[in-house]
């Protein structure tokens, strides 16, 4: 085998010699390019391209050598041309495929079904009972039918508060009467439930006594016959007392007490729920492990039955962390379906949080160079709709909402997917040229 030399070896060999020119001397050899570092195999097309480029490189070396007086032959053979790739045959038909509903073995656990509201047959006065949960698969998947559709509860407050203009114009004439507000939500806006927020009980707002706040709950119960959720002000010191008194005046109605959390006396709220026949909303802040901990404490420390717990893992609005809320809810639902019995509960979303995003209610961008945001009368409801629908796909069951248009659109879409609303079939095969 011939000894291999590098061009630098030839230069070094003549470095110590007083040679000005070589006459009658021909240096023969081949130039080799080491491609050993390439991974993933050697493509024939790449080989042809490298051969062509190497031939050009050899010609350059020959010309340079000629400039210095070295005899060289320029007539090197041209590199072989790269053969054009064969044209792919024109596709006439799609590859035939058949979709079969999968039976995912990992989804072995059913989500707990939780009733809200007691009818006369159950010892209460509600006109209907709402059921949430009961799923055996992710929402709207064909793997297992959803036993219960998504439910919407519309917010009512025990005092006049500041609302986005697009929301306020729907309620302005009833905001001083929680009972009339609740009645309008049910009769005109088709609310499945009502959530009464006792925000005036906050010591920094009106510091309304629990006994007086309980009268507002009675007013709402008499005004409507749908199930209700009862919320406090968010004050961790006062909420347990307020919710306990509200639970007492609503005894036997199976309301949803909102909410028990790790930063307040959850045991007092759980005790009131058990004593007066209510459900408990287990609220945490975008933390699946905290949700597991609170659920575990409600079940094992407070002896709350599984069919009385609904989770609220927190809703972050579109543009303000919706991706975190979605991921958290989806992880919770997947873990539950795969057997985590500390998470096998239906979920609730404070979808109204969408109105906390400034993009939902501001007239336009504060930046002069920004683009037009469009009319807020449309933008605001869309913000709430997108927030709600995103979490519906993640597995949420109950939606706390405000704008009547948002409520109508979310119910229309989710009930269409659920199968209770028939819609015109759309040909999706021609989706590129379809007109909306």
From Swiss-Prot:
Keywords: Methanogenesis. InterPro entries: Ac-CoA_synth_d_su_TIM-brl (IPR016041), ACDS_complex_subunit (IPR051069), CO_DH/Ac-CoA_synth_dsu (IPR004486), Dihydropteroate_synth-like_sf (IPR011005). The keyword Cytoplasm does not apply. Gene3D superfamilies: Dihydropteroate synthase-like. Heterodimer of delta and gamma chains. The ACDS complex is made up of alpha, epsilon, beta, gamma and delta chains with a probable stoichiometry of (alpha(2)epsilon(2))(4)-beta(8)-(gamma(1)delta(1))(8). Belongs to the CdhD family. Part of a complex that catalyzes the reversible cleavage of acetyl-CoA, allowing growth on acetate as sole source of carbon and energy. Probably maintains the overall quaternary structure of the ACDS complex. This is Acetyl-CoA decarbonylase/synthase complex subunit delta. It comes from Methanosarcina mazei (strain ATCC BAA-159 / DSM 3647 / Goe1 / Go1 / JCM 11833 / OCM 88) (Methanosarcina frisia). The gene is cdhD1.
